[in-house]
Amino acid sequence: MRYAMNKIPALLLVGALIIATVASGCIGGTTTTETPTVTKTKTQEVITLKVIGPWSGAELDAFMEVLKAFEKQHPNIKIEYKTYRAEDLSTILPLQFESHDTPADVIFMWGWFIAEMGKKGHLMELNNIINPEEYVPGILDSVTVDGKIYGAPFTAAAKPGFWYRKSFFEKHNLKPPKTWDDFVALLEEIKKIPGIKAPIVSGDSVGWPLSDVTEHFILTFGGKDLQLKLIKGEVKWEDPQVRKIFEEKLVPLLKAGYFSDPIEWTSAVDLWWKGEYALYFMGTWITGMVDDPNDLGLIPLPGVKAMVIAPDYLMVPKYTSHPKEALELAKFLATEGQRIHVGTKSGKLATWKKVSIDDYWAPMRDVAKIVANVESAPDLDDSVGGEWQKVFWDQLKLLWVQPDRLDEVLKTLDEKFPKK
């Protein structure tokens, strides 16, 4: 610590010291000590941002790497994370927002929900931190209302096709198909392998893995345009072009026993990995669920035109106590945070175009290249949502075990579809 001192010529300084020494000896031993000048440094206030998202387990571990990177860059900001299901938030948030309150500063939620809350005036506009030109085309559509961006895109899961173990294919001299006929022939060949219960394991929970398989067939043989028209209700499920996809492509595979009956999806991962099944349709997050992701290969349906790219969206409620810092975090998550996230075992894809293939975790690089060469499409049942989504799941579970009831399934999907 420095003391305040005037600049005194050397000779005068020496003289002053001599006089001071003599004086101190003559004055009854009394010593006067100056108090040094202390400069007080203002400590920067540390604030806490609360973040709500859907992740837990290994997925949360990957996301926490992103949050830790933000905290490292912003030592004055600490982050608290809580896990909530979107289904629960859809009930909790509207009530809190109406009371001008929020449980967190940054919240991950469905795109359609964010748009709805934005229209009601509960969210901050993000146009100043999000440049649409920097993102995958169309990725902001679901969170933009009248030109106002209410949701920021994070990374996305893709639902790109059927996964297989490279070691399994090498052991049985199997090759990925190039045509639809090749695909059917491959299933028949796999079915004959001793110990195989079915060529394809059918993951299930509430029904969504089956919906992902179905949408992959629609996108391959009907394209993105048909998927969008089904979402909007502009094309019926009993329409000939939709029925044809079921009758000529999906249902024959079900009847031939190429798909297993629905099995709880995480258990299905283990059974497939052990070799009881050869193929498994699942999202890219499966790369973080297996022992050796480098043993994974991917087979999209031959001729696929588009794939479901399902981004995670985040919003900043108007009722945050720290709007500046919350927007700073939102911008980070939508940009450089994506670069960090795709480098983890998250199994996610970037929606920010400034992320390169080299930024990806190695087992995801080939997947990223495949997805880059097709159109991105929204998830059908998530886009429609509501009670119809549950009907869709239930009807597909019925179709999987009783494919002869296709007419009944398609009719029910039309009857239960939300009316405009």
Swiss-Prot record:
One Gene Ontology cellular component: plasma membrane
Organism: Pyrococcus horikoshii (strain ATCC 700860 / DSM 12428 / JCM 9974 / NBRC 100139 / OT-3)
InterPro entries linked to this entry: Bact_solute-bd_prot1, SBP
UniProt key word Disulfide bond: no
Lipidation feature positions (S-archaeol cysteine): C26
UniProt subcellular location: Cell membrane
Entry membrane topology: Lipid-anchor
Name of this chain's protein: Uncharacterized ABC transporter extracellular-binding protein PH1039
UniProt family annotation: Belongs to the bacterial solute-binding protein 1 family.
